[in-house]
């Protein structure tokens, strides 16, 4: 029975991956930064800046895709009776690990999702990120096998699970109303100034959120499941994203293979690898990549909501203290922070 179910799920997961890859390329066509149709880390970073939690003027914009991801997941979970508020599993640990995951992502300049999209755009620097990401996941799996756990979560009242989606609706209202206390990157002032129209971004987020909720897509979970159980279906979804985005980039002329001159990327292979090693390691301990955490938060999981707040805090720390990389390369502060993060996760 389980094998039959898996056979039915796999084509759907692959189909969802193809659609998500197409949507990611379309978002670039409609205005998002190159190789950044979707990037959970970057979009959370931009939103954090827009809300005033960091002062990096080049990366400040409330990204509707994030709102859409959460609401798309929430709506489908409610429709399929999978909205099940839970939480209380090591919230402080999740917050701190989330911070370090973001610091690792901003060393690499992208989350696991963007890593795939960078590869699809011909950015060979992402190969080093992928190698580090795999190493980090293997390290996390090692600790899981040794018995590491953040302990069980507990059933909560529906209102608890609904708080995070409601917060996202509030953030969307702030984007549309654009009050003076919300910060936006000026035209041509950096990646924050490049974005698709609000409606297009929101619809894209809703679609991807719903698909990710239904398929349980997770880059970290996909690789973890291959290592632990020999189960490929989740990973096939991300391979489908890679292939469809690659084809889309070639059709639209966005495929530019090479190392130098890649958009919002640097060529330091060592720190690309170490940044994603930190991200992969932390995500295994958390039980999912940043995309999966947003989807779970939309389903009412307050542990994942805490993790998302940790990711946003990590973005604020990274930009306020000079930890984030730029196209010119990593910073000394960022290098130190990544090493500290790896040590903290190991300990």
Question: Over which residues does each language-model region extend?
Answer:
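Membrane-interfacial helix-loop segments of redox and metal-homeostasis proteins
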Residues: 1-347
